[in-house]
Amino acid sequence: IKIFLLTVILCLPGCTKNIVVKENVFSTSCKEKILIFPFKNMAAVYGENVNSRCPICGKVFMTGEVAEDADNMLTEQLFILLKDRKDIQLIPASQSQGVVSDLLSEHQKRLSERDLLVETGRALKADCVLSGNIFRFRERVGGKYSVDLPASVAFDIHLIRVSDGRLLWNDHFDETQRPLSENLFRLGPFLQRKARWITANEMAVSGLKDVLKSFPVPNKPEPKQ
């Protein structure tokens, strides 16, 4: 019986080794206003199943299927997860749409990705812009306890200062859920997920929460003597 139970556990869903990597975490010199820029579908730009480089941080991801409306879902979740913070003031992504259209028309689409973010933030009087790219957002095929194809999600996120275009902070999430037998070191997430195969939405929201754990806090002014 013990051998049987061990075999069952090892076949239950775990995840890949790499979920979140903390990198380039700076103490920001932003004041308060941060524009949430809509997530961009990079598979629509580069195609599926190719190695693509992030135009902001340079990290390479394998693209894949991106479910319909995944970009809007992640953009909305990013806003929800940050909106209650007292140290920042968010500008919703919806306010950027008209500005982006005008900038692309004015510059005949020759702006770099970073310049587009900076100019949009400047037009909306933001101190920083928080943007992200989606490389994969593949839904699971199957149910909670048995799948033909597991969920797979990859995205990155960046905080850029408007005044000089400097990248202040960035982080990323990259996971394809695997059976625990393929990675016994992922027992923690395996237990948190109640030994089941999760959806792409669940994976993405969980990954976004993990990524935001390293999100920097704006500098506070020195107290007057």
Identify the role of each PLM range.
Residues 2-13:
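Bacterial N-terminal signal peptides
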Residues 42-133, 162-170, 201-218:
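N-terminal segment of the mature soluble domain
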Residues 142-145:
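Extracellular loop and loop/strand-boundary signature of outer-membrane beta-barrel proteins
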Residues 6, 108, 191-194:
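Short N-terminal micro-motifs specific to bacterial/archaeal maturation
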Residues 15-46, 120-124, 136, 147-154, ...:
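C-terminal/domain-edge helix-coil "capping" segments
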Residues 12, 16, 55-58:
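Secreted/luminal cysteine- and crosslink-motif detector
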